[in-house]
Amino acid sequence: MGKDVALDFLPSSLYSCTCSCDGKLAFCDSEKVQILVPSTEANTPKFMKALAYLDDVEDELPNCQMLAPNELRLGDLTPSVISRYVVWSPTGLADNYDPLLTVLTNRHRVYFFSSSSRVLHQKWTCVAQMSTHLPSDPLELCRIHSVAWSPLVSLPSSSPWGVCLFALGAESGHVHLSIMSHSSTPFFKSFDLNCSWVVQLSFSSWNVVGDSATCLLSCSSRNGEIRILKIAISSHSDTFDTAMQELPFSLDYRPFSPLLAWSSPLANVEYLALVYPGHLFAFRYDKSLGKFCSFLNHNLLSLCSPSGVLFGHNDIDTIYVYILTHSGTLETFSLLDNSISMLDSPERHVLEKFLNNHLQNYGSVSDDSIKTLKIHGFCPSPYLSSAALHFSISYPASFTYVVTAAERSYFNFIPSLFSKSVFSHMITSSLNNLCVAPSAGCLLEISLMNDTLKEKTDIFTMLTNSLSSFLVTDYDFFLELKHLIDISSLSNLYLDSSLNAMRLLYGWSVYKQKALDATLLNSLRYRLTLYIMLYTLSQISLDPSYLTSDCKAVLRNFVSFTYKELAEVPIAMEVANEIAKSLEVSSDFSETCPACEATVQFNNTSLATCDNGHVWRRCSVTMLLLSQKAAKYCAVCNSIVAIFNPSQTKCLLADLQNELSICFYCGGHFLVS
């Protein structure tokens, strides 16, 4: 377990704690947001601390003197901008952007923050303001009271980055929805829910059928009205369809909004939680039937207003509900089939022991009863291997000591005891679809699990044993690939379980062991080369003008590489000969040095040296020389890829740039150098 991290501010009365898919944490305070960035480098702290300031967004705020008295809100009258809620986007939206930090302020505006430093992540600045994408009249339409991101979903023939939905709840009773993907800008469609201020939003998981997917968006208003939108998207369209869906159960009306949260799916079932002061409702939704089937309810111990509700699960049949109150208490329940009960499991005891240990470790006062612990934020990590806990300790016995201690807050991870089931869930998710399971986040979760296990285990051995059934030889892979009738998309390279298994092993060797696994790297390169050549042959048969001169240069490298490395593999040679015949490429093809025009023989896939000694790096995908070309590099394994400006919108280079938009070798996201 990592050492506590002391945060830079006293927790405000507005509780928020959020964890990104790549392991970053954000904690909400008044005029700034504390951000913790995980570090895997040797001899460095576990987390690098940074702050996002809201000072630079004040000039965008409305002039209070221009507002009528009935249009004024409390946030308009405060002297400074205050963060009310923070949440991470499920992915970055462009190269050089990790998941964006979404901040909702007391002035009912929403901003995206990102780090401008790619190394230390110390400077976080505003990169987008959502009010510029919303209607400005009437004012209620652009006053935002709630924010939510859907999970990522990857559809056939779509970008490896996946797509997601971004929702804003407005004061007018509208929900603004936008589809977000790689290199996209927000374009909102507004839906009138016929209710008061929309103050709570929560997305369910996606239900994918063929090339379309659906999810539910649950909404609650300030006056307690509940609305549910069913949203459908398709890989053939840039827009989406919506329809209202009713809860088939009647609840006693309560004139205030509950907290909302959806669980992750378990055996094709997920739960929608509605949490009121003193009461919890859990609605069971069957994804295969597409409807709510039953609901459970339970009284809470605390009658305080809830400030957060989160879900987790430990194995194949139990879902947990974590409820945090404004008084700083945390209640945990288990959902099993048709029952709900206060959780009394090993994980509960771990939590209590963890908190009691912290109460004993802070200060030198002998009487532990005078120490007070408050939990300000509790957030399970994306893969549930641990939970982020934000807490503070106060000592009311001494006024002087109260001031000293109360101005400190801390963060730590609570490890999960169900490491085997969590590990299995993590591996399964990564094998099925690397697109919606970012490599950096998955590897960080495995690293956290490795650090918190009582019995030290060789994670590489665990990974190898778990993935052994998915690892196939290069020859078997080539044989299966050669029998494919039509290779229509390069994105399918990220949906192959064998490739994803190799990516996990290779990514772990680089991420934790700080060493390249040459065998895995070469095998991945062999498979990439053959797949691209087969894809090219498929595209040439449809469009003879598919290849530009630059595209042909890439294929010449592929042919040379195949002749050199795979000369004893008949299947690979057959494909290379077919490409060479159409391009009239000889087996002794050579390149020209960009500096002196001397001959460069193709002897290495990473480096190229001309006859006069000039050394050039090669693109890890195309193997072209990186002379004057712009390039980007993977944030996980540091592989370098050239940025091309293809002369045609539909050609091999354009497809490589668009469809291989995350690292082929480990699934990491690219940074622009």
Swiss-Prot record:
<dbReference type="GO" id="GO:0006384">
    <property type="term" value="P:transcription initiation at RNA polymerase III promoter"/>
</dbReference>
<comment type="subunit">
    <text>May be a component of the TFIIIC complex.</text>
</comment>
<dbReference type="Pfam" id="PF12660">
    <property type="entry name" value="zf-TFIIIC"/>
</dbReference>
<dbReference type="InterPro" id="IPR024761">
    <property type="entry name" value="TFIIIC_delta_N"/>
</dbReference>
<dbReference type="Pfam" id="PF12657">
    <property type="entry name" value="TFIIIC_delta"/>
</dbReference>
<dbReference type="InterPro" id="IPR044230">
    <property type="entry name" value="GTF3C4"/>
</dbReference>
<protein>
    <recommendedName>
        <fullName>Putative transcription factor tau subunit sfc9</fullName>
    </recommendedName>
</protein>
<dbReference type="InterPro" id="IPR036322">
    <property type="entry name" value="WD40_repeat_dom_sf"/>
</dbReference>
<keyword id="KW-0804">Transcription</keyword>
<keyword id="KW-0805">Transcription regulation</keyword>
<dbReference type="GO" id="GO:0005634">
    <property type="term" value="C:nucleus"/>
</dbReference>
<dbReference type="GO" id="GO:0000995">
    <property type="term" value="F:RNA polymerase III general transcription initiation factor activity"/>
</dbReference>
<keyword id="KW-0539">Nucleus</keyword>
<dbReference type="GO" id="GO:0006383">
    <property type="term" value="P:transcription by RNA polymerase III"/>
</dbReference>
<dbReference type="GO" id="GO:0004402">
    <property type="term" value="F:histone acetyltransferase activity"/>
</dbReference>
<dbReference type="GO" id="GO:0000127">
    <property type="term" value="C:transcription factor TFIIIC complex"/>
</dbReference>
<dbReference type="InterPro" id="IPR024764">
    <property type="entry name" value="TFIIIC_Znf"/>
</dbReference>
